[in-house]
Amino acid sequence: VSDHACFARAPLRAGQTTVHASDLLPIAFTRESLNILSRNVQRVQDKLARPIGVENISAYLGWADDTLAEAGFFNELAERTGCWLLLDVNNLVVNALNAGAADPVAAANAFVDAIEARHVGEIHLAGYSEKTGETGTLVIDDHGSRVHAPVWQVYAHAIARLGAKPTLVEWDTALPAFDMLLGEAREADLLAQAALEVAAPRVERRAAPKPARIPSGDRPTYPSGEGLT
């Protein structure tokens, strides 16, 4: 069970009837928002008697009063409530592109590096589209195409950094032939396998304990014909 870190209902003006936005609206990354979201997540978990996942969204607007880094916000949410995080890699790239990041892949990778690996329970991938108008180009998380190259790059980095995670390729509109869907799933498998193989030596070098040294007088002896090979 999972849901997005967002809100969808709000009054247009103070005192007016609450309306539904029919979209995922971004929350402010502040202490107040963290308190509200933590309370709501805990209420759902108490009702369901299980931890739930909370997903980062693609945000086309931001809040001027943000005071917390997004990754830090999610880390603290997970620490407070025991929820797990659903990391949407496509949303990271979409947000970086719309923010005008000089290097969108590096910006998305920085989020991955800041998130606690133990909190991440699942990863999402998807395609995006670009819409150009009078005011410029907007990147839309529309789940209507193949996964783009920058998203694959960040996914490989995420697997190397976070370890193997269940991964879902989302494709909701303009559905292609089934073979193409399977191809995207295979690509995710291959990239994950390659990333884990590259990461494994680094992890082993960092984590492997030094061989224990046994004083000569304490070394075990074995009957003839028995021993360690």
What positions do the PLM features span?
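Active-site acidic/histidine proton-transfer and metal-coordination neighborhood
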Residues: 2-85
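Conserved active-site loop/cleft motifs that coordinate metal ions or position small ligands
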Residues: 166-172
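Active-site-proximal loop/turn and secondary-structure-junction residues that shape catalytic pockets
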Residues: 5-9, 58-60, 91-93, 127-131, ...
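Gly/Pro-rich active-site loop or hairpin
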Residues: 31-34, 95-162
